[in-house]
Design a protein with these regions (language model features):
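Transmembrane helix irregularities
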Residues: 7-8, 25-28, 210-217, 353-356, ...
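Membrane-interface micro-motifs in multi-pass membrane enzymes
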Residues: 7-11, 51-60, 111-113, 167-181, ...
Length: 440
């Protein structure tokens, strides 16, 4: 390798260790799985043309699936197990393909269609390795990764005196990570086996919450504000049913870290968190007098419904909502018209209703409701403490998914797509693992 470099062939010299690393990852797909999870927290897209970008996690995903296929062939495995989520995923994929064929601009539809296929492959990978590695272990690592990103966010936010919003290395992906991970950490805290564990997961929840504060993002905070009370309600219901824990005890466990976080923010509201409170105040005012992003969402939702009514079967094509101002030129006359260009519908259901028509919409609704139903059933079963942690975490994360598809920017592309695959894959793996235990 050194000789090649000295001979004036540095590219060949670099290619050798790179080839060794790739070969090692191909032969060790379990390690590649962990690398994929870590790479989700690095937002570093490389643009190829005007409509395509490759992310580090996409490259790792390619290596993971190549390794899975290689392992499958070398071990001569036969048959594939299917979960309750495979059918709606496949129907959603078919709907996107059909919408691509009839798209307003097919060049904008190719990449989003590939994205759905990649999400499905990621779901299958998580489903498989969730059973091998363990669902609880994967969730635990996920919580730590989100908390570390949150720690980076709040540290840099304080360092800058609260002057700028900080998202960290995950960039906007932190919104999806944080709004799922904080309630999951709260679930782990509720069913912790020791005081040490309660302090640990309570600390992780606070760190993730501080990370949200540093971003000043309103969507994740709203999601958490909905999810945590629901978690307490269903936890109390489960505890009463199993007669093993009082409601007051559950409330105290959540109450302490929640009050600590809220008190800290309010203590510094006139200094470090001035910008944060002004953004949230603007959101509350917009509920009665829509303006800013609230008004924009109303316009986008109305436009999505209008688009569906004109194209009910195939939609305007996956990935084509960003061109909706070309389809309806009158949108350019609206006050917030400039912000419509290149936007999603900021409602995943309406977005897919507009882009893929009724079939894609129903597939996504079915997938969401199946996820919620299966997660609730798993959560309400009488389980061991560690299994309770995983089941409760998946249930509340699925609640967050079902709620936020109504108002968040994206769930089916970028890092959000991989988190979606992670949640459904872990849920399928958890269900499969419980069924195997029951048979034994």
């Amino acid at each position: 390798m050194i000789l090649l470099a000295l001979m004036g062939k540095p590219m060949f010299a670099l290619a050798i260790p790179l080839a060794v690393i790739v070969a090692f990852l191909l032969l060790n797909p379990r390690l590649t799985f962990w690398l994929l999870l870590i790479s989700l927290f690095v937002y570093a897209p490389q643009r190829i043309g005007t409509t395509f970008a490759v992310h580090p996690f996409d490259l790792v995903m390619g290596l993971l699936y190549a390794g899975i296929v290689l392992e499958y062939l070398l071990k001569f495995k036969q048959g594939l197990k299917f979960s309750p989520f495979d059918a709606p995923f496949i129907i959603l994929l078919l709907a996107t393909v059909i919408s691509m064929v009839f798209a307003y601009n097919i060049s904008y539809a190719i990449v989003p269609c590939i994205r759905i296929f990649v999400i499905y492959l990621a779901f299958r990978a998580v489903y498989s390795y969730g059973q091998i590695i363990g669902v609880r272990k994967i969730i635990n690592v996920y919580l730590w990764l989100v908390a570390l990103n949150g720690a980076y966010n709040i540290t840099l936010f304080i360092w800058q005196g609260g002057q700028e919003r900080v998202f960290g290395p995950a960039y906007l992906g932190y919104e999806t990570f944080s709004m799922t991970a904080l309630p999951m950490a709260a679930a782990f805290m509720l069913w912790a086996q020791s005081t040490r564990q309660r302090i640990l997961y309570g600390g992780l929840a606070i760190m993730i919450g501080l990370g949200i504060v540093a971003t000043q993002a309103r969507g994740p905070l709203l999601a958490v504000a909905i999810a945590v009370p629901l978690l307490i309600f269903f936890a109390a219901r489960k505890s009463k049913r199993e007669s093993n824990r009082s409601r007051g005890h559950l409330l105290r466990l959540i109450f302490i870290p929640a009050v600590a976080l809220i008190a800290l923010v309010f203590l510094l509201k006139d200094s470090l968190f001035v910008g944060l409170f002004s953004r949230y105040e603007e959101m509350l005012v917009s509920l009665t007098n829509p303006k800013g992003t609230i008004a924009l969402r109303l316009i986008l939702w109305e436009t999505a419904i209008r688009t569906f009514l004109d194209n009910p079967i195939t939609g305007i094509g996956i990935g084509n909502f960003r061109l909706v101002h070309h389809i309806y030129p009158d949108l350019k006359l609206m006050p917030l018209h400039w912000w419509i260009f290149g936007m999603s519908a900021h409602n995943v259901l309406l977005h897919y209703l507009a882009e893929t028509g009724i079939v894609g919409f129903l597939a996504l609704v079915t997938l969401s409701l199946k996820g919620l139903r299966h997660s609730y059933r798993g959560f309400m079963q009488k389980l061991s403490q560690p299994d309770n942690q995983a089941a409760a975490a998946l249930f509340i994360a699925m609640v967050v998914f079902c709620v936020t598809i109504l108002f968040m920017r994206a769930w089916t592309w970028g890092q959000g797509g991989y988190v979606m695959a992670l949640l459904f894959g872990l849920l399928a793996a958890s269900r499969e693992t419980r069924e195997i235990k029951q048979l034994q």
